[in-house]
Amino acid sequence: MKKHLIILLIVINILPLFAQNNQQRFSRYILANSEVGYITFLDGIGNLEPLWFEAKLTSNYLLRVRKNSSTGAVITPKMILRMYQRDSQPVATPSYMPQITFYHQLKNFHPNRAHIFYLFGSIVHHSNGQDGDFFNLDGTINTDDGSFSTNYFEVGFFLTKLLKFQENTTEFFRSYIEYHPRFMQDNDDLIKIYGNLRWHNDIQIFKF
């Protein structure tokens, strides 16, 4: 009887730890798949015009229905700031890119399972806070104060893989479709120039 009681107490103590690890991994994996801020100096990322700096300011807020739920959502307010190398060193109006992403874990975490699969879908807004014409008089795109705004969806999956050769290291593979519906656009010229469908793939490795 005493032996059975000890075994029962051990099981009772282990179950909350396993549940806690499951919850922690869910939150950790979801946030690892979310937006990350950065600051770059001089050139920025993907910009042709000289910059002093570019900064992406972002934070992620995880929402879950209950602690042991396999479904959750992340709200991400995001802004991008740029200071140009011009007279008076102006800081341009920020780009606003808030989004909400919904996640669903297809299989519960298990210590012996190396792969965990998630589905996700996002609703994203992107605008630059300007009110000028989209095109210049010569027909080129107005990158100075041209009004830019778009809304779109992202749908895809990401897969986590625990790397056995490196402790506490996880590999993420993500693939998703970005779709810009015409009825959600303020300007059809954006779709004519850039299209409304894109396919993204990326691989990340995190050490927690």
Residue ranges and their predicted role:
Residues I6-I7, L48, R64, H110-N112:
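Generic structural signal for short, flexible, solvent-exposed coil/loop and linker residues
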Residues A19-V65, I100:
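Short glycine/proline- and aromatic-enriched beta-strand/turn motifs that initiate or cap beta-hairpins
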Residues N21-E35, A73-K207:
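Outer-membrane pore/translocation modules
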Residues H4-F18:
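Sec-dependent N-terminal signal peptides
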